[in-house]
């Protein structure tokens, strides 16, 4: 587990006005932290900045002891479940779950072992050969969650994980 620290974080798309201003938060290892607010207030943008998918235009983001503002997403050692699930339609459930492991060059045996474990945990064992279009919304959501869990990252960001 790693500490996540947002120090005076701001976000501007036009360099004139901030859509997120001066956020200061420390999330300790093992802590369960929830962002709550009305639609359009910047919750998803904040998660995307932590993940490295959106530029931080002000302040400092630390993961562990390391400042990560300019670190690419692949180097941040975290996983993310997206609001829209972000599944690859041409891949099977099994391939979607394993995608990040394949990119990280995890052995086939280890990928398969982790996939079986997480599929059992989330009730997806019977769906591993199906494509996302063959699944209900709740099943797709569980595939996205499985893909995040299977990576065993110390930090997991979830954008509206219970929306379905």
Task: Enumerate the language-model features and the residues they cover.
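ABC family nucleotide-binding domain
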Residues: 1-164
């Amino acid at each position: 587990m790693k500490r996540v620290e947002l120090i005076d974080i701001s976000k501007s798309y036009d360099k004139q006005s901030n859509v997120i201003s001066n956020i200061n938060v420390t999330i300790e290892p093992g802590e369960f932290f929830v962002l709550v607010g009305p639609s359009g207030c910047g919750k998803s943008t904040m998660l995307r900045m932590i993940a490295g998918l959106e530029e931080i235009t002000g302040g400092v983001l630390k993961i562990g002891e390391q400042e990560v503002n300019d670190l690419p997403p692949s180097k941040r050692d975290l996983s993310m479940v997206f609001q829209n699930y972000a599944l690859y339609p041409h891949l099977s459930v099994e391939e979607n779950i394993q995608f990040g492991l394949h990119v990280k060059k995890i052995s086939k045996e280890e990928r398969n072992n982790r996939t079986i474990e997480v599929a059992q945990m989330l009730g997806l064992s019977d769906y591993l050969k199906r494509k996302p279009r063959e699944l209900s919304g709740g099943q797709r959501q569980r595939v996205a969650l499985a893909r995040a869990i299977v990576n065993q990252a110390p930090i997991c960001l979830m954008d509206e994980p219970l929306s379905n």
